[in-house]
């Protein structure tokens, strides 16, 4: 059994700025992944960070770690609301999505019709980028802020039967 812990109060505060009440924070586990795992994964509602990146409190770490936490918590949100992240990741891998990180590349914000049309990694990237902007870690133009509001409207106004979960076979953008 890997070393694991619950979210800290600071991590919950960070997460609430994006996920509000749409995550069961008490159910989230942060785990130290086996040594052979070199990337963070969230296949089952828990987050497994590679050993060198497992921290006692991501809210006390630098900005890149906080953004990474939001990315991984997006997969926990997906899992908690019925999207099988292990299957989504497997399908992306089978389609070459992790070669050159293609699965993470998002279309220009103006070309995204809705949050739900994105694959699981694109959703995580959009929420992590929005977090970076809203927390003041990265500047954004008024137009960019408006695009984020438009894309994330369904996410921020989700309800029990209306969750903008990713598509298993969403498009994969070409490598940049």
List PLM regions with ranges.
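Catalytic Zn2+-binding segment of zinc metalloproteases
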Residues: 73-91
């Amino acid at each position: 059994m890997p070393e694991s812990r619950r979210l800290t109060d600071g991590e919950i505060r960070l997460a609430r700025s994006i996920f509000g009440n749409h995550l069961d924070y008490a159910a989230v586990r942060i785990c130290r992944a086996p040594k052979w795992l070199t990337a963070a994964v969230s296949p089952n509602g828990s987050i497994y960070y590679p050993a060198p990146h497992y921290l006692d409190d991501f809210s006390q770490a630098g900005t890149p770690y906080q953004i990474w936490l939001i990315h991984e918590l997006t997969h926990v949100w997906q899992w908690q609301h019925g999207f099988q992240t292990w299957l989504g990741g497997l399908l992306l891998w089978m389609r070459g999505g992790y070669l050159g990180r293609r699965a993470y590349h998002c279309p220009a914000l103006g070309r995204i019709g809705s949050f739900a049309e994105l694959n699981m990694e694109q959703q995580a990237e959009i929420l992590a980028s929005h977090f970076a902007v809203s927390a003041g870690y990265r500047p954004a133009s008024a137009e960019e802020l408006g695009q984020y509001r438009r894309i994330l409207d369904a996410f921020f106004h989700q309800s029990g039967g209306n969750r903008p979960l990713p598509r298993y076979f969403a498009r994969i953008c070409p490598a940049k």
